[in-house]
């Protein structure tokens, strides 16, 4: 039931899919997190190699394309502990999208 609800919600963003897959994936992950925040396990995840954000909800991982593999993802709140310089770069370039 939850998976159907999530996929139905994601489908509403079909026209913005390209944007959320190429540069704004953090913001779509936040949309999903806030929309499905009633689930305690709902959290933002990050793939260090692919530089991609997604949301873990009810044990499954989602981005704007639907359910995706969890391989290579780590909890976003753990990235700072993993590599503080990488964390700062991600915030600057991918979340805030600051000009250099």
Regions found by a protein language model. Give the residues of each.
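A structural boundary/capping signal
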Residues: 1-100
């Amino acid at each position: 039931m939850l998976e159907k609800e999530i996929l139905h919600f994601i489908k509403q963003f079909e026209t913005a899919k390209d944007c959320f897959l190429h540069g704004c994936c953090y913001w779509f992950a936040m949309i999903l997190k806030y929309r499905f925040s009633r689930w305690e396990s709902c959290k933002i995840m990050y793939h260090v190699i692919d530089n991609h954000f997604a949301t873990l909800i009810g044990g499954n991982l989602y981005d704007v394309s639907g359910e995706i593999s969890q391989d290579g993802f780590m909890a976003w709140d753990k990235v700072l502990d993993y590599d503080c310089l990488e964390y700062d770069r991600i915030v600057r370039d991918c979340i805030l999208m600051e000009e250099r």
